[in-house]
């Protein structure tokens, strides 16, 4: 009897997966702001939020056996910058990095053709184009063979947010990510990112 139940449950999962063969792509763009704080944080970073834009794609995988629950990984590119208003050093800094959110999302009906969703999951960020923070300025990485120095490019976060989708075509979403960075070598910074954007489903 137990074996039969196990087989029936497995069949239900498989049938559900087949029934939900649809997989949605989401091309999104929006505004993002990053704030830094912590004992090891520089005076510039602690007093200046880095603001900018992001753009990228997400892909949603459906599991119909668990109604409303989906897995939504993504690949986003962020560009953010800040400029000193006091004339101190550095006068201008910028960051560009790739972000890989790995969200679990729960979708629920709101009204008519509108749905809402909560999502949460880990986020991996990797700096690109040679920007590293060192001695109060961003420099090109010269220690390409030093694996520990390369870790300054990477930071981990945990994100959560809310999204609303209209007519299965347009999605508005907001998220907040909490994380730890080694942007400055041998120092630990807390970095939080607020993102608000629009996505087109296809």
For the regions a language model picked out, list residue spans one by one:
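Bacterial Sec-dependent N-terminal signal peptides
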Residues: 1-28, 198-202
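Residues that define the transmembrane beta-barrel architecture of outer-membrane proteins
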Residues: 23, 49-53, 94-100, 152-158, ...
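Repeated loop/turn-to-beta-strand initiation elements of outer-membrane beta-barrel proteins
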Residues: 25, 67-69, 112, 164, ...
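Transmembrane beta-strands of outer-membrane beta-barrel pores
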Residues: 31-35, 61, 77-81, 99, ...
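Flexible, solvent-exposed loop segments that connect beta-strands
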Residues: 36-47, 79-96, 128-152, 182-187, ...
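Outer-membrane beta-barrel architecture
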Residues: 56-60, 101-105, 161, 197-199
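Outer-membrane beta-barrel "beta-signal"
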Residues: 164, 190-202
């Amino acid at each position: 009897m137990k074996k039969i139940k196990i087989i029936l449950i497995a069949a239900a999962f498989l049938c559900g997966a087949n029934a939900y063969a649809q997989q949605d792509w989401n091309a999104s763009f929006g505004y993002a702001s990053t704030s830094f704080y912590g004992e090891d944080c520089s005076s510039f970073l602690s007093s200046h939020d880095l603001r900018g834009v992001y753009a990228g794609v997400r892909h949603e995988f459906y599991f119909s056996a668990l109604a409303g629950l989906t897995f939504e990984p993504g690949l986003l590119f962020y560009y953010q910058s800040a400029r000193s208003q006091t004339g101190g050093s550095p006068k201008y800094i910028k960051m560009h990095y790739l972000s890989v959110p790995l969200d679990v999302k729960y979708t629920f009906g709101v009204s008519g053709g509108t749905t809402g969703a909560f999502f949460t999951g880990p986020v991996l960020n990797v700096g690109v184009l040679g920007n590293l923070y060192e001695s109060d300025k961003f420099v090109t990485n010269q220690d390409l063979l030093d694996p520990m120095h390369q870790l300054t490019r990477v930071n981990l976060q945990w994100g959560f947010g809310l999204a609303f989708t209209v007519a299965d075509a347009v999605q508005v979403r907001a998220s907040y990510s909490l994380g730890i960075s080694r942007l400055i070598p041998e120092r630990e910074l807390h970095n939080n990112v607020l993102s608000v954007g629009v996505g087109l489903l296809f």
